[in-house]
């Protein structure tokens, strides 16, 4: 199950990280951190993709089911701070899913990996 946490200060999406040997959720925009309770297990890994891997192509008007609007994520093209986001399992099941974003202003689509 994937749980998305949002920053209480700026409403941006928070991602799990290690900080000083402890598991925390860190805001991608303002850097706010919240320690994860010891009963919660957070696993993260970095995945390097090769050029030979398949690329997911979305039609311009196509939005996957479950896409949600989020504020506080900056578009790399127009610097708009609002986008749609969705999560897809683009690789093997034992690897983390990929987060996709689509800018509400210019329509640019980009992705983030854990």
UniProtKB/Swiss-Prot annotation:
Keyword list, A-Z: Activator, DNA-directed RNA polymerase, Metal-binding, Nucleotidyltransferase, Transcription, Transcription regulation, Transferase, Zinc, Zinc-finger
Entry GO MF terms: DNA-directed RNA polymerase activity; nucleic acid binding; zinc ion binding
GO biological process: DNA-templated transcription; positive regulation of DNA-templated transcription
Active-site residue list: 94-95
Residues bound to Zn(2+) 2: 75, 78, 103, 106
CDD domains found in the cross-reference section: Zn-ribbon_TFS (cd10511)
Stretch list, region C-ZR: 63-114
Role description: Induces RNA cleavage activity in the RNA polymerase. Induces rapid cleavage of a stalled transcription elongation complex with a 2-nucleotide reduction at the 3' end of the nascent RNA. Truncated RNA is able to resume elongation. During transcription elongation it enhances processivity. Involved in transcriptional proofreading and fidelity. Misincorporation of nucleotides during elongation of transcription leads to arrested elongation complexes which are rescued by TFS-promoted removal of a dinucleotide from the 3'-end.
Protein name: Transcription factor S1
Species this protein is from: Saccharolobus solfataricus (strain ATCC 35092 / DSM 1617 / JCM 11322 / P2) (Sulfolobus solfataricus)
